[in-house]
């Protein structure tokens, strides 16, 4: 038989190169391809949560395996919506994955609707984490200085417990202030203050932290801390208005890049630039801010490695 391992194959106008070595040593397995489990809600319309993560993570060459926490007809910012809580069904859903013996290179948690769901996520991590698994936690709790009405004081405390399991966490400025007990303000942050908050978060366990959405005059900044590598402020020019789902776009890129071994600062810069460009395209197309970021229009521009 002809050796095709190094052959180039043309498919739908694209060129692919087969892997030089067989990953499975001749045995079929669910676990030969990189996979990320994404625990989040599913909104049918509005470009957020799982409907954002599925295409972006897949485009970056990693299989995206959703764990829905709830099903919504559309993003809650649109007002009237259908909502179906999946808390009571999550355990049975996850149980089937246990039977399949699935292994994950990445686990991502996003918006969680109750203390019970936070407990389930912790249980999921304990069950499926291995030495090769990267855990990315987006501690979705609020924005613009306000904690979401669904988040009780008890849930905020539980979120603090959840991030202890993270390798990477991506809180926005509001969430960072809540987690560290820091008074929120809309601007004028000194780098030393951001460093102090990032250090507090790192003491809980995460190796890599990015505090997102920090207003800095005409810029939006993301403050990065990596244990053993120091800190960095990554800025992009402000663009358009705030939009739903930008955090989900950002964390999806960070997660796929982490599994693919991309440098963290490089990944943060890539994600920041992509979100900004998506906002500009959305403004150009006159898409309402509640509809999220039109990332589909520019997905092909996203660097895969």
Q: What does each of the following model-derived ranges do?
A:
Residues 2, 6, 18-21, 27:
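Polybasic, lysine-rich low-complexity intrinsically disordered segments
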Residues 178, 241-264, 268:
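Short, small-residue alpha-helix embedded
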Residues 44, 231-245:
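Short pre-catalytic strand/loop immediately N-terminal to key active-site residues, enriched for Gly-Thr
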Residues 29-137, 141-149, 295-297, 301-302:
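Conserved N-terminal subdomain of the carbohydrate kinase-like
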Residues 149-231, 241:
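Conserved phosphate/ATP/ADP-binding segment of small-molecule kinases
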């Amino acid at each position: 038989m002809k050796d095709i391992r190094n052959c180039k194959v043309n498919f739908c106008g694209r060129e692919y190169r087969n892997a030089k070595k067989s990953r499975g040593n001749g045995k079929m397995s669910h676990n030969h391809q990189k996979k990320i489990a994404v625990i989040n809600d599913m909104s049918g319309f509005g470009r957020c949560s799982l409907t954002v993560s599925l295409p972006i993570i897949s485009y970056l060459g990693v299989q995206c395996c959703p764990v829905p926490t709830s099903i919504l007809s559309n993003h809650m910012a649109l007002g009237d919506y259908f909502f179906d809580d999946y808390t009571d069904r999550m355990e049975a859903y996850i149980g089937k994955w246990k039977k399949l013996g699935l292994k994950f290179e990445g686990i991502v948690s996003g918006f969680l609707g109750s203390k019970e769901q936070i407990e389930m996520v912790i249980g999921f991590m304990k069950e499926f984490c291995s030495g090769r698994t990267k855990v990315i936690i987006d501690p979705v709790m609020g924005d613009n200085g306000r904690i979401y009405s669904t988040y009780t004081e008890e849930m905020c405390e539980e979120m603090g417990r959840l991030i202890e399991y993270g390798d990477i966490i991506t809180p926005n400025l509001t969430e960072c202030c809540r987690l560290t007990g820091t008074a929120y303000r809309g601007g004028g942050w000194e780098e030393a203050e951001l460093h102090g908050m990032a250090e507090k978060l790192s003491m809980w366990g995460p190796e890599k932290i990015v505090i997102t959405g920090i207003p800095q005059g005409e810029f939006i900044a993301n403050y990065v801390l990596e244990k053993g590598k120091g800190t960095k402020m990554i800025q992009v020019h402000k663009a358009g208005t705030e939009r739903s789902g930008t955090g989900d776009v950002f964390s999806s890129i960070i997660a796929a890049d982490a599994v693919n071994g991309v440098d963290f600062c490089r990944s943060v810069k890539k994600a920041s630039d992509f979100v900004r460009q998506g906002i500009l395209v959305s403004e150009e197309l006159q898409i309402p801010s509640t509809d999220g970021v039109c990332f589909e229009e520019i997905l092909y521009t996203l660097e895969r490695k």
